[in-house]
Amino acid sequence: MVNDIIADSITRIRNASIRGQEVTKLLYSKIVEAIVKILQEKGYIESYKVVEEGNKKFINVVLKYEEAGKKKRPVINEIKRISKPGRRIYKGKDEIKRFKNGYGTIIVSTSKGVLPNDEAYRLGVGGEVLCSVW
């Protein structure tokens, strides 16, 4: 059993993109689905699909790559878990304005749901910083 499903999902995505895999399978939870949806909206992944195998649900994530000469380079340069079960990190709306000069995204769990940093700033809400990606 996984203690931190968000960290597990982020690690699976990071490892699959480093290895050049097209698809990776994540354990299902509503918060992981919300994170993956944001990654798709921001263009970090190609697509995702929730599948059921027996009595368990999974999320199949199709990773996105750029052509760099003869090699394919992952679109996700770095994806990192920020707030952890042992040490929660909360930021106010003014502290989550920009990340990596606008080239990266911070995913925040707010009272209005799981949101990217630009949308949370626009709505004027802060929250728990789940992860960063660029």
Swiss-Prot record:
It comes from the Bacteria. The gene is rpsH. GO terms for cellular component: ribonucleoprotein complex; ribosome. Gene3D superfamilies: 3.30.1370.30, 3.30.1490.10. The keyword Transmembrane helix does not apply. One of its GO terms (molecular function) is rRNA binding. This is Small ribosomal subunit protein uS8. Belongs to the universal ribosomal protein uS8 family. It comes from Nitratiruptor sp. (strain SB155-2). Pfam families: Ribosomal_S8. Part of the 30S ribosomal subunit. Contacts proteins S5 and S12. The keyword Ribonucleoprotein applies. InterPro entries: Ribosomal_uS8, Ribosomal_uS8_CS, Ribosomal_uS8_sf. SUPFAM superfamilies: Ribosomal protein S8.
